[in-house]
Amino acid sequence: MTQAAKNARNPIDDTAPERSRPRVMMCPFTNPTNRYIQIQKDLYSSIGYDVVPLSIKGLLKGGLFQLFKPGNILAFHWLEYRPFKRDKGTARLSLTGTLLFAFYCTLMLIGRAKVVYFIHDHAVHDTVGFNRRLSMRIIALVRRLADFRVVHAPDFQAQYNAQYLPHPLYWDVPGQAPATLKKHGERPLFSLLGVIRPYKQIDALLDVWPSECVLSIAGHGTQAYLATLNEIIDKRALRSVVQLDARFLSDAEFAQSIADSDVLILPHTADSMLVSGAFFEAIGRVPLLISRATPFMVSAARKFDNVMLFDDIAELPRIVRSIGESWPAIGRNSGNLAIDEFGWNACRRRYGQFFETVEGHRRDSVEKPVVW
């Protein structure tokens, strides 16, 4: 049983009177493809907040008044994605999305509730050229409009003038059904899970993948990128060792795929996201992780002895083969350490302290620039 299941109270339970609880007005309020948003909502509820959607519909139903209560908080995640629309694997500027983004920026400017902006990415995924540079400018704008910024990677606190808060473990939250752990065999199963997109450089990985090692790739991807990957698999005759399961995985399927993995590979480029969500699904559950040496993963490797790093994709075959030769003795169990760092109770403590700081902050003392 996880620490959260044993020790945490109901995420929506609080002894304070309902009407006295401050509100977190959250955008987005739902995300059907990622449990992160639901976990965040449960965290806010567990530390004493009512969590409500920040949306046009909600504002019209009486939520507008809540914008002007200094004790309330506006929490934004991935707001920089609003001005863009993804089409055939590429994110491009959208007029309707830009107008919606401008609407949310206006709410930040006119309201008295504190604004907390969670920075997840250096740039919007799948943008190139002008759109990529624009997305970075948009992130910079929202950073300036926000009263507080949060990052899940401690090394980026100074760069983004942000507070570090741990990213919660997906498997250590109240109500999370445990996945069935498999018995690890004599031959390790390497896995690459989640969305199949160019920023993960899976094509470069397949170009050097050892033909004697088993690899499972699973997740939703665009037809164009999948065609590229299948072409490499066929060209290098990897069909017998590489399984490409190109479809959306439910939460239960993703969790079970993690549990079935012996080694998880995180090849994301350093200039895309600050942290990989898959890391927080895997750490403490998967015996080994291989990752590109991004700043967060370098710090993770200092804490967890089952995290192995590479700087260049050309180094990957040597690492993969060395694991195969040393398996299963090389596997590690880092569950307790992962709970100490990123578990539900650790997150409740850190988020509670941070939100107390936010509530004590005087909104009218912050100058809000409107140009960028």
Predicted ranges, named:
Residues 314, 325-360:
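A charged, aromatic-enriched C-terminal amphipathic alpha-helix characteristic of glycosyltransferases
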Residues 228-252:
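Nucleotide-activated donor-binding/catalytic signature segment of Leloir-type glycosyltransferases, i.e.
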Residues 181-200, 206-218:
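Conserved donor-binding/catalytic core segment of Leloir-type glycosyltransferases
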Residues 215-229, 247:
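Glycosyltransferase donor-sugar binding loop
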Residues 256-273, 287:
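Acidic donor-binding loop of glycosyltransferase active sites
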Residues 303-314, 320-327:
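Conserved acidic donor-binding segment of nucleotide-sugar-dependent glycosyltransferases
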Residues 139-176:
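Donor nucleotide-sugar binding/catalytic pocket of nucleotide-sugar-dependent glycosyltransferases
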